[in-house]
């Protein structure tokens, strides 16, 4: 059969008038009611049966069936899910399986609004389905209801389909006016036609009397100009707002607003509905670009603020009001469809191309183009913020839910927001594309795969937040920022209470509080003893202080990481006194040499000494933990004035997974000393366990130190290769590395991503004083949260009393199989892969007694 071959519609006169429906045609019927669609669908089905065509009816709507049951028609029921991607892919797979020359009928596309709440996604469904049907030489009939969709939505359908036919009826006649007939033309084709259902006559209207009657019918269905541009999403919200303004019951409307805009997580839905007022929903909609969900991060931020407002109004008075915008999840799919990326998106979902297509897809996401309509909405955000910096943050549908934090898996991008409007728009668009592309990062894909989320819709909504802070010269930053944990079982001092909560506090932007930065340490604060520190001398406090500050450089159009002396001169004296401490020992040493020099370091002492502020942050977290019925972590900023006033900006809140130990490990008491490879105390983080180790991967500290700097990342890649080799093979592996794992600085340790180490049972960081490598767990960092969620044991080998025994030379007794993973002779000298599977090598961790032993049996 040749493509574009004429077929019979069951109405011969219509075939003549339209020069026939052809193979490949998608025929959209815009009707006032579905009975009008049946007038044309029934003859089409009857004719297809006569012609021995294969006929498929896609049934997904709640309306009465459009096709009667008969053996010649295959009815395929597809549950109408709120998950656009799942629904669309299911239909595509069926179409692909059915193959060429199939005749289709679809339920009413207008019904898709009940699941997706927006014209945008209905249009996206049609725009990806219609071309696919066209390539298979099918014929498909689709009804849509007149007046249900905006002009923009219908225009997208019109631009995609081959035929769009408008049907009108009165008591006497049925009228058809073609709006589009692709690749066909005649003198009368686009005139209104009268269809006589009894005789099958289909004639163009040529006389004035009939034309007058047609336009009388047409006039009944006209909408005002404003209504034509209003889609179902806006109509719903406008109706809900009208009910609210007229003091009518809005309970049902609020439930719907929560379900279609806020979250799909049932626990979070319950809390949102409990704490949100109708005005809260309207405020979200008023600050929203596009449609769909605002995502987990945005929902958590808004919910936490509503909880504080409702249950702690005194604290709410010091909360900085948010002025965020939300880019809805539908914009993500629309961007993919607009740029022709849908095919690669569908392929990437499949098991065989899940990882292999990710990089190509990410590159496409970075290089796509936004529609003019979307750009105009982005300009609204730029006009609102003026030239103040803002940040574009991921807020995916699955992110920050119960059990799925996605900590550090997706990008956040700061925008300095300076320059011409065109330059600022380009910077904003590039930031959005970068976050979109991060959904295809190896770490994100691996995280979703390990947690069974790889088949779920992961639409990327965005949270756009003005950077909270002040200007210090050309630098812009908050006075302080941090992450907080309502519960932290990992004590940096023996006497602190895990239930009191803990902070990682930094000066400047909060990125330094969640990343492992070279030689820089955030201030750890236990909220029962805020001023307590594990350092006993000023020299130690200085050594283990925050060395680098991050701020938005408005002149350089970037985020800049600076040493303290680069920004200290811009700080007003009152703020310097709050954030900085004097190193009196160092100053005295200089004076003894005749030098009068002020030596200060970041300690945030003025903040942790503020008892009211510390109590309020603690109260916020305990309040949220009580409402969530689960530990939480928050992100926040603190800004302070010279008068002593301050404001807290609550930027994020999500459920926090913590280890809940299931029992005491059985560590034998009679282990011979010569059998012990490692024994330490008070150095581990993770559940109690007794596990037989199959492989031990050791990065030799001295060999790694002597390795050229530019080659060090190859060690991380090799570890990743080992991880991926054993992925899903139920191997218990131990990784031993010098310094910090997951650091961005190779001179501090091995710069792996979490995806590189996700298959390991345990991670061991090794101190090596000669090379300057120091373990550092980084409580609260993204790598910390990854280890907790994956239940990977962390331990450290310190050169102090915590390490009772460490005999790495014993590992040489096992076969080194590194050659299975690399032929690089230099890497073979640095990385060793010891196969312990044929002999018994046991790892025991006793969380209760804080003791770990790795030994040979």
Residue ranges and their predicted role:
Residues 2, 184-221:
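C-terminal regions of RecA-like/P-loop NTPase motor modules
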Residues 6-61:
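Glycine-rich P-loop/Walker A and Walker A-like loops and their local beta1-loop-alpha1 context
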Residues 24-32, 54-56, 101-103, 139-141, ...:
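Residue-level preference for the first positions of well-ordered beta-strands
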Residues 51-114:
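Conserved inter-motif catalytic segment of the P-loop NTP-binding fold
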Residues 115-116, 121-148:
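Substrate-engagement module of ASCE P-loop NTPases
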Residues 145-197:
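Phosphate-binding/switch region of NTP-binding enzymes
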Residues 147, 268-271, 275-314, 369-768, ...:
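Conserved mixed alpha/beta core segments that line enzyme active sites in large multi-domain catalysts
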Residues 282-347, 352-372:
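A conserved helix-loop-beta module that forms one wall/lid of the active-site cleft
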